[in-house]
Amino acid sequence: MSLHHIANRTKKLPPLRVGIGGPVGSGKTTLLEMLCKAMKNKYDLVAITNDIYTKEDQRLLTVSGALAAERIMGVETGGCPHTAIREDASINLEAIDRMLVDFPDADVVFVESGGDNLAATFSPELSDLTIYVIDVAAGEKIPRKGGPGITKSDLFVINKTDLAPYVGADLGVMEADTIRMRTTPKGLKPFVMTNLKTNTGLAEVIAFIETKGMLQAG
């Protein structure tokens, strides 16, 4: 299905596809849940979740009430999760097509990848905007390790900042390393430091999606 020729779509612009990636346990599903809850009264949303052998993230989002159950589709990727978002994204592209049959006027399609390493990136065929999430508990050194998720994502999210004192992480060092790794000849690529337990940084993530994705409510 062409995103520019969706049957029964009444909106002029195609849906915005937002890919959310990051290592296991970084907070991808929590971020997706909070984005859906905060944005669903303003925008028409659907979500695709990726797990290797289960549909656990789909279940978690459904139980939490992030969206109506029929607006969340779980994909079992098998094998390496990055394959399903990069080398062969067909399983996710098919999932998007199926969701758009039922919800042709969707404004945003969120695609959450399975937990993966710092080298994972989304195929441009699958995602218009990419958000890469790490968590402070994984170590202060993570931003300076680099990798496409850290250096090339449209938005880089450093999550669980509240855990810094407990794991000996210096947020100032992480911020400085992030600035160094995400500075390009065209300027600094955006990043946000978040504590999703208290909604800290959530508004900035939403503003990024709305601005860069050129969203129009209604």
UniProtKB/Swiss-Prot annotation:
Where does the protein end up?
Answer: Cytoplasm
Q: What is its main location?
A: cytoplasm
Q: Which GO terms describe its cellular component?
A: cytoplasm
Signal peptide per UniProt: none
Positions annotated to bind GTP: G22, P23, V24, G25, S26, G27, K28, T29
GO biological process annotation, one example: urea catabolic process
Name any one Pfam family assigned in the record. Answer: cobW
Described purpose of this protein according to its UniProt entry: Facilitates the functional incorporation of the urease nickel metallocenter. This process requires GTP hydrolysis, probably effectuated by UreG.
Which protein family is it in? Belongs to the SIMIBI class G3E GTPase family. UreG subfamily.
Q: What is this protein called?
A: Urease accessory protein UreG
State the species of origin. Polaromonas sp. (strain JS666 / ATCC BAA-500)
Give the gene name.
Answer: ureG
